Design a protein with these regions (language model features):
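Gly/Ala-rich beta-loop-alpha elbow adjacent to hydrolase catalytic centers
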Residues: 108-117
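Short, surface-exposed "cap/lid" segments of acyl-processing enzymes
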Residues: 14-16, 25-66
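Acidic catalytic loop of the alpha/beta-hydrolase fold
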Residues: 159-164, 188-189
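Short beta-strand/loop motif that positions the catalytic acidic residue
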Residues: 149, 154-157, 161
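Alpha/beta-hydrolase active-site loop
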Residues: 79-99
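Short alpha-helix in the alpha/beta-hydrolase fold that links the catalytic acid
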Residues: 149-151, 165-173
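N-terminal cap/lid segment of alpha/beta-hydrolase-fold proteins
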Residues: 1-27
Length: 214
C-alpha cells in the first residue's frame, strides 16, 4: 500500500497466510483486520476499497492487517466459500492480538469480505474474545451469514450497487433495526467515492469529545 508496508506469512490451518501489515506513526491505538472481496472475481488485499479501509484505520492510529484469502497471492489453499477463510482470519486476529496485546480490535470488510468478517465476529463473541467494532462496506449477505451483528456495526452501501443490491442489505438490517449509511449515486466499487468512504469510516470510528455550547 505504501513504502512502509511489510509483507509476512503466518501459519494457518492449510499453510501460509500471506499478509500485508501497515503501522501508524506513533504509538498504535488499535488493531484493524481488513478482508478483501471475492477471490474468484479478482478480489485481493490490494483492492482499492480494501486499501481505503486500511488507510482509514491507519488514520485512526490502528495497525492495519490485510491478509489474502486462500488461493490468492502466497496464501495456501483454495477458495472455501467463506468457511476456511473465516478460520484463516481468526488465526490472523489471534496473531495480531499477540503482537499488540490489550489494544482494541476493528474488523473491516468489503463485499465477500463482509460475509467473512461477520462470521469472524460471531466466532470471537462465542469464544468470549469479541472485536470492539465491525465495519461492513458493500455487505454481501449469504445463506450462512449470521443474522445479527452488534448494534454499533458500521454499514456502508452504495445506492446504485449492482453487485450486492441495496434491497438485500435492507432486508438483512431491518429486523436488527441496524442503521445504514447510504452513498447516493454510488456503485459497488465506490468509484470516485473512495476519499469520501475513508472520511466516513474515520468519522464513524473516531472517539468524540462533545462540549455543550455556552
Amino acid at each position: 500500500m505504501n513504502a512502509n508496508t511489510t509483507v509476512l506469512r503466518i501459519g494457518g490451518p492449510v499453510g501460509d497466510i500471506d499478509v500485508a501489515l501497515d503501522r501508524p506513526e506513533g504509538t498504535p491505538r488499535g488493531i484493524g483486520v481488513v478482508a478483501h472481496p471475492h477471490p474468484l472475481h479478482g478480489g485481493t488485499r490490494d483492492n482499492k476499497v480494501a486499501q481505503t479501509l486500511a488507510r482509514a484505520l491507519l488514520a485512526l492510529g490502528h495497525i492495519a492487517w490485510r491478509p489474502n484469502f486462500r488461493g490468492v497471492g502466497a496464501t495456501a489453499g483454495t477458495h472455501d466459500e467463506g468457511r476456511g477463510e473465516t478460520d484463516d482470519l481468526l488465526v490472523v486476529v489471534d496473531y495480531a492480538r499477540q503482537q499488540a496485546p490489550g489494544l482494541p480490535l476493528v474488523l473491516a470488510g468489503f463485499s465477500f469480505g463482509t460475509h467473512v468478517q461477520i462470521r469472524v465476529a460471531r466466532r470471537l463473541v462465542d469464544a468470549g474474545r469479541p472485536a470492539q467494532r465491525l465495519v461492513l462496506v458493500g455487505t454481501s449477505i449469504r445463506a450462512d451469514t449470521p443474522t445479527e451483528v452488534p448494534a454499533d456495526t458500521v454499514v456502508i452501501h452504495g445506492e446504485q450497487d449492482d453487485v450486492v443490491p441495496l434491497i438485500g442489505v435492507l432486508d438483512w438490517a431491518r429486523p436488527q433495526s441496524l442503521p445504514l449509511i447510504l452513498l447516493p449515486g454510488t456503485g459497488h466499487f465506490f468509484h470516485r467515492r473512495l476519499t469520501l468512504l475513508k472520511h466516513i469510516v474515520v468519522d464513524a470510528l473516531a472517539p468524540r469529545e462533545l462540549s455543550v455550547a455556552q
